[in-house]
Amino acid sequence: MNIKQNGFTLAELLVTLAVFSILVTVGVPSFNQTLLNNRQVSSLNILVGSMQLARSEAIVQNRRVTLCGSDDSQTCGNSWSNGWVVFVDGNGDGQVNGTEVVLRSVNDISRLGITPGGFGNNFMYRPNGRMMANNNIRANTGQFTVCDIRGAEHARTIVVDSSGRPRASKYNIDGTAPVC
């Protein structure tokens, strides 16, 4: 009685493993780049969304709404890299006080470095939707530079124009490349 056996020979198995290892070696680094790109774009979108929320709430409520960097997602701090807070700034001092309504707080932003340019630790949207930085009515444009572990080559910028509208860009306001 002849029994036919099904399966792979050792040579077929070794060839399959070799092809698989080549594909993994080529594919994993590009997957890592895709993952880093997605983290950066996601954080950019969250920050732009927070700016759009602040601007629209300032117009709708006819009040000043402030965004500030935050270390604990509850109070204003010295860094934007740990997160930020969006709040209705009733007294216009640029700080979250006990009676002010927090509209959004963001933390854990995927290990990115966020550096504000032109508006320091906080900026405010006025009831007309225009931006004001550091309580200076003339400071009405600015940018954020967002960097990850890949450095300046992959940095992105959020540019806020004089009307207060934020947009993501590969370049600074003046057209130069961002620096991390």
Where are these regions (language model features)?
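N-terminal single-pass transmembrane signal-anchor helix
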Residues: 1-31
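N-terminal helix-rich module
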Residues: 2, 26-42, 46-48, 52-56, ...
